[in-house]
């Protein structure tokens, strides 16, 4: 007969190569804490419901608390021979307290167990990732006031378009990161529901109290349908999708850093601690964190695709196809969180050269739109006509080797070719990128006052969201504390009926 905990049906054990192919213990270690927490809550519920006797409940809880203490001290390691984290914890419990340890698995399956553990891990990751994103937003919006007038060229179609400020650019990326954090926390209400008690797929003939375990585990409520609870992985797709979108947003940001830190642009300088050199070219300084943030976004996108493909052909009811979610899912979440943290730190130590940006904008015609606007506002020229006149000016300047710095040329051309008289003093101001930037007044624009408004609004939003995250985190801490306190009470001699009155449920 097989020696596995499930081996009664089998005449022999699986071979070593089958074990290597099928085990998940090697990637389950992150769920160990949560599996023990879940076990304690489940045993408390079984005792409270009268499914297990009080002596058995006390013995089970004593063993589990001992295991939790060992885990906290780093002394609990998973054995791949036990296949997964769930069989590992049960096997270790039986080793500690004997056959009574087998009563822990009453009215439970690994199918609802793994879903419960994975949701518990994911909800904590949602809080961590959202918090990191929001602190990144704080850094971006809390940049020095001088960066509201530090000029950068703004681009469309990878061509110089209009002057913007460093602070405006940071505020734009901050908005994207705020949406990323919103997507993550919006998933909370679909993640933080309790599959425990669904068993294999159809529920159980035991009278379980799923509301009680939901409370002890910090879930909002039990999942409604047992078959759905054990079968679905759409929530991993949702989180992976949010991670993929967020990773792509960070990739776009870092693409600009890579470009602007090149010698040709010389708009940004990445700190040495976020760059590496070349093994052959002594002069090189490579922005490797920014480059890898671009490259590693592919992991998150790839994970999303793999999860979708994994789930598409699996009908309701658990199949081992679904265990393939964990390596790629955890990997994507880890990579995305690491990328957030490193990009945030790099941002704090990246210097921008506003003088260089202003010089580039003088020479790349990016203030031409402002000339057209002046023709509309001061000379009552229809915008389409003003657009054509300014385009004619740019074409003539390019043909003659001029830039908008040559105000003598621009004023002469407008006067002689289009009968528009603007003084050289006024034209110099109109074409000055910093003056143009200061002139923007529309809501949401790059004008310093408007950027200040964006920063103020965004920082207030961040403060509110961080408070919500702290509340959610506190609720999880309190739920675990209540669960452990109840377990210690039973081990210490409190009867299960007394415990029920003590917790007020």
Curated annotation (Swiss-Prot):
It is found in: Cytoplasm. It catalyses: 2-(N(omega)-L-arginino)succinate = fumarate + L-arginine. One of its GO terms (cellular component) is cytosol. GO terms for molecular function: argininosuccinate lyase activity. Its main location: cytoplasm. GO terms for biological process: arginine biosynthetic process via ornithine; L-arginine biosynthetic process. Pathway: Amino-acid biosynthesis; L-arginine biosynthesis; L-arginine from L-ornithine and carbamoyl phosphate: step 3/3. Keywords: Amino-acid biosynthesis, Arginine biosynthesis, Cytoplasm, Lyase. Its EC number is 4.3.2.1. It comes from the Bacteria. InterPro entries: Arg_succ_lyase_C, Argininosuccinate_lyase, Fumarase/histidase_N, Fumarate_lyase_CS, Fumarate_lyase_fam, Fumarate_lyase_N, L-Aspartase-like. Gene3D superfamilies: Fumarase/aspartase (C-terminal domain), Fumarase/aspartase (Central domain), Fumarase/aspartase (N-terminal domain). PROSITE patterns: FUMARATE_LYASES. It is an enzyme of class 4 (lyase). NCBIfam families: argH. Belongs to the lyase 1 family. Argininosuccinate lyase subfamily. This is Argininosuccinate lyase. It comes from Rhodococcoides fascians.
């Amino acid at each position: 007969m097989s020696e596995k905990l499930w081996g009664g049906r089998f005449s022999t054990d699986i071979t070593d190569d089958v074990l290597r192919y099928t085990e998940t213990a090697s990637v389950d270690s992150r769920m160990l804490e949560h599996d023990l927490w879940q076990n304690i809550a489940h045993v408390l519920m079984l005792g409270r419901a009268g499914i297990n006797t009080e002596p058995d409940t006390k013995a089970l809880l004593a063993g589990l608390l001992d295991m939790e203490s060992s885990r906290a001290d780093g002394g609990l390691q998973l054995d791949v021979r036990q296949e997964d984290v769930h069989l590992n914890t049960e096997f270790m419990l039986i080793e500690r307290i004997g056959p009574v340890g087998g009563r822990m698995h009453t009215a439970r399956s690994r199918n609802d167990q793994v879903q419960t553990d994975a949701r518990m891990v994911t909800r904590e990751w949602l809080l961590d990732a959202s918090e990191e994103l929001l602190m990144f937003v704080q850094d971006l919006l809390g940049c020095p006031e001088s960066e509201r007038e530090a000029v950068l060229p703004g681009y469309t179609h990878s061509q110089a378009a209009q002057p913007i400020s460093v602070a405006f650019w940071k505020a734009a990326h901050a908005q994207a990161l705020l949406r990323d954090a919103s997507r993550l926390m919006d998933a909370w209400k679909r993640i933080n529901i309790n599959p425990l008690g669904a068993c294999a797929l159809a529920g159980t003939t035991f009278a379980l109290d799923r509301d009680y375990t939901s409370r002890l585990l910090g879930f909002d409520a039990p999942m409604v349908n047992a078959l759905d609870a054990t079968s679905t992985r759409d929530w991993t797709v949702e989180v992976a999708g949010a991670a993929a979108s967020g990773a792509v947003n960070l990739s776009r940001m870092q693409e600009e850093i890579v470009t602007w830190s090149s010698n040709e642009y010389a708009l940004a300088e990445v700190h040495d601690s976020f760059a590496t050199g070349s093994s052959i070219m002594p002069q090189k300084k490579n922005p490797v964190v920014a480059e890898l943030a671009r490259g590693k976004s592919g992991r998150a996108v790839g994970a999303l695709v793999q999860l979708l493909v994994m789930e598409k052909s699996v009908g309701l009811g658990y199949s081992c196809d679904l265990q393939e979610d964990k390596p790629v899912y955890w990997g994507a979440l880890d990579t995305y969180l690491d990328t957030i943290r490193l990009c945030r730190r790099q941002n704090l130590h990246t210097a921008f050269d506003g003088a260089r940006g202003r010089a580039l904008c003088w020479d790349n015609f990016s203030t031409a739109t402002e000339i057209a606007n002046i023709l509309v506002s001061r000379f009552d020229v229809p915008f389409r006509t003003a657009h054509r006149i300014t385009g004619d000016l740019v074409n003539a300047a390019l043909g003659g080797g001029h830039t908008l710095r040559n105000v003598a040329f621009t004023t002469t051309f407008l006067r002689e070719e289009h009968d528009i008289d603007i003084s050289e003093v006024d034209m110099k101001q109109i074409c000055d990128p910093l003056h143009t930037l200061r002139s923007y007044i529309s809501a949401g624009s790059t004008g310093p006052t408007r950027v200040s408004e964006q920063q103020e609004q965004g920082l207030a939003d961040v403060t509110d969201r961080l408070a919500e995250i702290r509340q959610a985190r506190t609720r999880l801490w309190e739920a675990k504390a209540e669960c452990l306190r109840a377990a210690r009470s039973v081990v210490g001699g409190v009867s299960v009926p007394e415990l029920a009155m003590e917790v007020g449920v």
